[in-house]
Amino acid sequence: MPLPFVFRTIDLDGNTIRTAVRPGKPHLTPLLVFNGIGANLELVFPFVNALDPDLEVIAFDVPGVGGSSTPSSPYRFPGLAKLAARMLDYLDYGQVSVIGVSWGGALAQQFAHDYPERCKKLILAATAAGAVMVPGKPKVLWRMASPRRYIQPSYGAHIAPDIYGGAFRRDKNLALSFASKVRSSGKLGYYWQLFAGLGWTSIHWLHKIKQPTLVLAGDDDPLIPLVNMRMLAWRIPNSQLHVLDDGHLFLITRAETVAPIIMKFLQEE
């Protein structure tokens, strides 16, 4: 049985950051989770619970999301990567492996680039290289640009099939269940997250990421078309691509399928 999450709220650089750690065993390098835009840390719990119970997992709400405070001014990805490193110091972690989902995948790339000695392995799920990405359909991106789906759960459930694709197209209850777990902190935090990625790209330094990297993609992802994950796998030297028969949120909808792939990657020497 995996141990329950231990929640802590910590003060870092003027921010109140809500963290959750699922304790594990010392023979496995802990895994740090960077979540998607507007997504509170509880949304990754089903995925985390599918992983090996010996794997220690660290999750947190970025500033302006869930239980973390909303800063009065915007931030960028390098600043967030620094905040994550400071959080690891505070929680007494040295080296970790990192998984980044969607928006969090950009932050994961930044962290792996800026703190290579802290990041043992990198997992990028349903994400892209930023400003140079091949975008999804305008209607999908327009809906994504608004925090309404997090503030109004019924609207979130209504548009989920169009923006997440995959299993969300087939199972209406999935969208309702997902929407019920969302904990919104309001519009400003969401807009700060959008601003963090404005004009940002990793394309010119992806070749400098030396960590073993697993790129995970869904073949029916309306937000981040598959070609973007192929580009990441092409640009990152020590990477492998794994494509799943699902949409944008395969970590949640296909947790039992994805977890063994991730554990195999993390345990490879």
Region locations from a protein language model:
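Conserved HGGG/HGGXW glycine-rich cap/lid loop of the alpha/beta-hydrolase fold
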Residues: N15-G67
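Active-site loop/oxyanion-hole signature of alpha/beta-hydrolase fold enzymes
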Residues: A59-I99
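Gly/Ala-rich beta-loop-alpha elbow adjacent to hydrolase catalytic centers
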Residues: G100, G104, A108
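Flexible "cap/lid" loop of the alpha/beta hydrolase fold
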Residues: Q109, H113, C119-R149
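Conserved alpha/beta-hydrolase catalytic His-Asp/Glu region
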Residues: M133-P135, P153-W205
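Short beta-strand/loop motif that positions the catalytic acidic residue
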Residues: I209, V215-A217
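Acidic catalytic loop of the alpha/beta-hydrolase fold
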Residues: D220-I224
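Catalytic histidine-centered segment of alpha/beta-hydrolase-like enzymes
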Residues: G247-A259
